[in-house]
UniProtKB/Swiss-Prot annotation:
Keywords: Antioxidant, Disulfide bond, Oxidoreductase, Peroxidase, Redox-active center. Gene3D superfamilies: AhpD-like (1.20.1290.10). It holds the Pfam family CMD. Disulfide bonds join 131-134. This is Alkyl hydroperoxide reductase AhpD. One of its GO terms (biological process) is response to oxidative stress. PANTHER family: ALKYL HYDROPEROXIDE REDUCTASE AHPD. The lineage of its organism: Bacteria, Pseudomonadati, Pseudomonadota, Alphaproteobacteria, Hyphomicrobiales. It comes from Brucella canis (strain ATCC 23365 / NCTC 10854 / RM-666). One of its GO terms (molecular function) is peroxiredoxin activity. InterPro entries: AhpD (IPR004674), AhpD-like (IPR029032), AhpD_core (IPR004675), CMD-like (IPR003779).
Length: 175
């Protein structure tokens, strides 16, 4: 399955989603590694099998397997961190902020790809998962690494488009 196959499954009520998928595929703000890593990480984070399969397949022919593995790792580790740190951030009891997380996160310091790219993917997944604390932390790392606001915005735009594709497919499944 490809992005074109995915677009063909998007119903007419979500025409904007189809158009946004097209614009995402032709984006030139990001490097190919950043773009296809976002496809994989956000496709997985969308929790929709069709979206995940299409975007992983799209990336498979365009980037090295190490990029795909690292993007999978970003989605996986953010699945854990986003739940934990969203709780820490939202809990009324602020004592949790001073407690050690006791969660293994070695992949963040050694992702097997450029750390900036991994941070970009982590930011996008954190946006999908709604963890403000993680969003702030990853955005701060990216800005300190001189990543442009346009690249950061593009990553989050990809996340929003990919998530909307998953929701459009779920909505179509109710008809």
């Amino acid at each position: 399955m490809s992005i074109d196959d995915l677009k063909s499954k998007i119903p007419d009520f979500a025409k904007d989603v189809r158009l946004n998928l097209s614009s995402m595929a032709s984006n030139e703000t990001l490097t190919p590694q950043q773009k296809y890593g976002l496809f994989v990480a956000c496709g997985i984070a969308s929790r929709n099998a069709d979206v995940r399969k299409a975007l992983v397949a799209e990336a498979a022919g365009k980037v090295d397997a190490s990029v795909i593995q690292a993007a999978k790792a970003a989605a996986s580790i953010m699945g854990m961190n986003n739940v934990y740190y969203r709780f820490v951030h939202l809990a009324s009891n602020k004592d949790y902020r001073t407690m050690p997380a006791r969660l293994r996160m070695n992949v963040i310091s050694n992702p097997g790809v450029d750390k900036v790219d991994f941070e970009l993917w982590s930011l996008a997944v954190s946006a999908i998962n709604g963890c403000g604390m993680c969003i702030d932390a990853h955005e701060d790392v990216l800005r300190k690494a001189n990543v442009t606001a346009e690249a950061i915005q593009a990553a989050v735009r990809f996340a929003s488009i990919i998530q909307s594709a998953a929701i459009a497919l779920e909505a179509a499944d109710t008809e």
